Amino acid sequence: MSIWMEGFKAVRTLNAAGFEAYIVGGAVRDYLLGKDVDDVDIATQASPHQVADIFTKGVHINQEHKTVLIPGEKGPIEITTYKGETLAEDLQKRDFTINALAMTETREVIDPYGGRQDLQKRLLRSYDAQKRLSEDPLRMLRAARFISSLGFEADRQLVKETTVQKAALQRCARERVVVELEKLLKGMETEAAFAFLQETGAIHSLPGIQITDSQLAELMRLPKQQWDSGDRAWLEFAICTGGPSSMAALPLPKKRKQLVAAGLKAFEYRQTQQRWSDWQLYISGLAIAMQIEEIRAGRQLPSIQKEELAEQWSALPIKAKSDLAITGRDLLHAKAAPGPWMKEALQAAEKAVVTKKCPNEKAAILAFLTMREDGK
């Protein structure tokens, strides 16, 4: 059963228990746009404890936000008590009219604030933008995200209020900023999104991010491509903004920062070299090398076909250090005292094998290292 159908099942269950309940927000928006629905939110007049009494298995209550998560086959479904006394009051408080939509169990759309018309116009609008943005300043960045992901245009009142209130973005938690910025970067219309942030001045109010005008110009030239990978999105960002230092203050996972740093190093290598050397391909890895060629192609730079890279990778004598025919134990047999020299020797052996200066055979490698030591 799809999460969309599971949502309707939950709505029917709440209705049968005597409570108003509706699928709301992005799920309804995406349904009307003909997009796949990936997650479902439900608004109800029932309190969290009443919801938990109805859905007894595996529920998780967030009392602060009056939300209950119930398990589903395709992921959890979020059920939230009305913000206000009625559905209309709840929808009024939502960020944009295109998200202020609800659907009954019979698929009747409830649209008190013109969200369907705005969907048709491809317009991003807030009901009382001044209030909506002051309630949650992150909505200014969310506006840019929807411009990128949906290809919509912000209405002039939203632009005006973002310009007025942009300084409030500094109060937003950086974790929330990262989520929205990543979704923006993954969208097709990044140029329009960054143009909105530039016009309003909001780009210079994002906490943890310092972007120069020239870097912003680079971001606005990102290719019109949709990326599923967060690693790819942040690598594109790093290339445009001068490297990992531009992301140092952002709470990204350590592994992601490491992958971005490795990707940036590989990109800079290809900026100065027409081909991948065997050694650079080895230390970068095939996945990163292929990603760099995709990035170059997207920027209309000369690029190497994936098949050619895969063939070069396949011809490498080893694909990882663990493939090396010797270990530190083999080195100790040749030289009794352990020490830093072992790491250096293994690295030299690894490079010699990859670059085909030495076959990947124990005796040959030990002989190579002996000659190297004698030549020092």
From Swiss-Prot:
Signal peptide as annotated in the record: none
Protein name, as recorded: CC-adding tRNA nucleotidyltransferase
Q: What does this protein do?
A: tRNA nucleotidyltransferase involved in the synthesis of the tRNA CCA terminus. Adds the two cytidine residues to tRNA.
Q: Which UniProt keywords apply?
A: Magnesium, Metal-binding, Nucleotide-binding, Nucleotidyltransferase, RNA-binding, Transferase, tRNA processing, tRNA-binding
List required co-factors: Mg(2+)
Q: Which PANTHER family match?
A: CCA TRNA NUCLEOTIDYLTRANSFERASE 1, MITOCHONDRIAL (PTHR46173:SF1)
Q: Tell me which residues bind CTP.
A: 26-29, 94-95, 99, 136-145, 176
